[in-house]
Amino acid sequence: MAALRSFLKKRSSVLCNGAMRRKLFSTEVSQPLTDSPSFAQRIRNLPKDLPGTQIKTQVSQLIGRTPIVYLNKVTEGCGAYIAVKQEMFQPTASIKDRPALSMINDAEEKGLITPGETILIEPTSGNMGISMAFMAAMRGYKMVLTMPSYTSLERRVCMRCFGADLILTDPTKGMGGTVKKAYDLLESTPNAYMLQQFSNPANTKVHFETTGPEIWEDTNGQVDIFVMGIGSGGTVSGVGQYLKSKNPNVQIYGVEPAESNVLNGGKPGPHSIMGNGVGFKPDILDLDMLERVIEVTSEDAVNMARQLALKEGLMVGISSGANTVAAMELAKKPENKGKLIVTVHPSFGERYLSSVLFQELRQEAENMQPVAVDYP
């Protein structure tokens, strides 16, 4: 410690010598960099497209082209290979950036919405709302979102961060109640428009045009099975339709919460797999294409999400855990030995810090006490 103090003292002495001393203690006020005429002029004259650069002109151009990676440790006992597309690398750390961009572009091209005039209203379970709020902020729309109150605090903060208005709905009414509230607002709000993620073909289209081709290209066309959780149904339908168009033998599976297994003939119910299990069949969901819809419990999804962080270094959300559980169920079947199964991790785990996923760790972190340090 004495040696450290001696070093710091010598370092301070060096910095304060000669011209450096005069500069540090000068009474002259330096002009801020951003206020200097040369800086401002340089920014104004900067071309949007500099030849030979890879600089994007706007953040929406960062959407897509996410990486895909094998799972290695959690797949012990599996006869098939499991590769996962990591949508956490999107601008808002979720796959919903894709359809949010697609649906807004589609509506603008059709003249249905106008920046600065149209108020966008949309029901969401979280990630789509964040992506829409992100796009609305970038394009200049006022955004109003309805969401069940059981969703995580991080979702609410993210939506508000992008300037969206947020209305929470009765958790016992599920997504059905959230959708109803959004339609009520639509009817009572002038110049309002709903992009309708659950019935908008542009939702499916973007996955047919981007997510599906990316998976096909990155697997060199060797994907045998694709499995995906069902929320709006856009991802599983769009990706499934594309993969089937390239190889009719590719098998497509959906995933839904066991506690809200509506697609398997059950009843809607509360669950922890945010983003999945909306409690009804979305219009854009192509059920006929699916081999079947695999049921995963909230408990299994949460436990798997935790294991993915601990064993694979992948901090992901609860629906990512559900997709992985379903993929592993298929990977353990003898008939799938040696096959390549692809699924998706839709979002980054940091968005779930206040949820059941990190409940114990959060409590542990909140109760941590500082230790004494002999310094200086």
UniProtKB/Swiss-Prot annotation:
Probably involved in the detoxification of cyanide that arises from ethylen biosynthesis in ripening fruits. Has only background level of in vitro cysteine synthase activity. It is found in: Mitochondrion. The keyword Cell cycle does not apply. Its EC number is 4.4.1.9. GO terms for biological process: cysteine biosynthetic process from serine; fruit ripening, climacteric; response to wounding. It comes from Malus domestica (Apple). Belongs to the cysteine synthase/cystathionine beta-synthase family. This is L-3-cyanoalanine synthase 1, mitochondrial. Pyridoxal 5'-phosphate binds at N127, G231, S232, G233, G234, T235, S319. The modification N6-(pyridoxal phosphate)lysine is found at K96. Expressed in leaves, flowers and fruits. It catalyses: hydrogen cyanide + L-cysteine = 3-cyano-L-alanine + hydrogen sulfide + H(+). It comes from the Eukaryota. Its cofactor is pyridoxal 5'-phosphate. GO terms for molecular function: cysteine synthase activity; L-3-cyanoalanine synthase activity. Residues 1-14 form a transit peptide. Keywords: Amino-acid biosynthesis, Cysteine biosynthesis, Lyase, Mitochondrion, Pyridoxal phosphate, Transferase, Transit peptide. One of its GO terms (cellular component) is mitochondrion. SUPFAM superfamilies: Tryptophan synthase beta subunit-like PLP-dependent enzymes. Induction: Up-regulated by ethylene treatment and wounding.
